[in-house]
């Protein structure tokens, strides 16, 4: 299988966009894959993806899979099942869990990779807040795929790291964070209330602060 080729699960959010730039900086040939699994943010995500890829003039076209019926077997705020009486970002964050989402997405990406003879899959997971964003899960998924179809390397450089790591990479790679889209309540604009909007705004502020701090250091 192609050694320097990778299937990227791309959502147009900060994490997968920074991962896109990270992969490009390492000279990977990227095959972007976007999956519509019935998420409320589908339109905004796809619009952001198309803009980012157009600006980068990437070699390979985006493959978009429309599978909105997956929302019928899933649950949570991501597919419009909003919780009642939410009083904190932590409660909203917990409600956004779509059970088994990353296993589903990685399985589809692996199938696509098999067709293209690509043995690497990249996914922009950060930290370990959910079970399917941990290193343990990713390693188990590699083993499962090896038993199922072929050996794959799951590239997830930010797994297990705090978001600050992503922001530092975004600054280093000059990622246009404001071109990204992350909202779990609205279809094509940011609600500025959900956890994803909150995290995105916080990330942009940290990114700008990082730039100011480095500029101040360079003055000495």
From Swiss-Prot:
GO biological process: queuosine biosynthetic process
SUPFAM superfamilies, alphabetized: Adenine nucleotide alpha hydrolases-like (SSF52402)
Cofactors that this protein relies on: Zn(2+)
Organism domain of life: Bacteria
Binding of Zn(2+), residues: 183, 191, 194, 197
E.C. no: 6.3.4.20
Binding site for ATP: 10-20
Molecular functions (GO terms): ATP binding; ligase activity, forming carbon-nitrogen bonds; zinc ion binding
Catalytically driven reaction(s): 7-carboxy-7-deazaguanine + NH4(+) + ATP = 7-cyano-7-deazaguanine + ADP + phosphate + H2O + H(+)
Cysteines joined through disulfide linkages: none
Pathway: Purine metabolism; 7-cyano-7-deazaguanine biosynthesis
Pfam families according to UniProt: QueC
Family, similarity comment: Belongs to the QueC family.
PANTHER family named in the record: 7-CYANO-7-DEAZAGUANINE SYNTHASE
Function: Catalyzes the ATP-dependent conversion of 7-carboxy-7-deazaguanine (CDG) to 7-cyano-7-deazaguanine (preQ(0)).
The protein's name in its UniProt record: 7-cyano-7-deazaguanine synthase 1
Native source organism of the sequence: Desulfitobacterium hafniense (strain Y51)
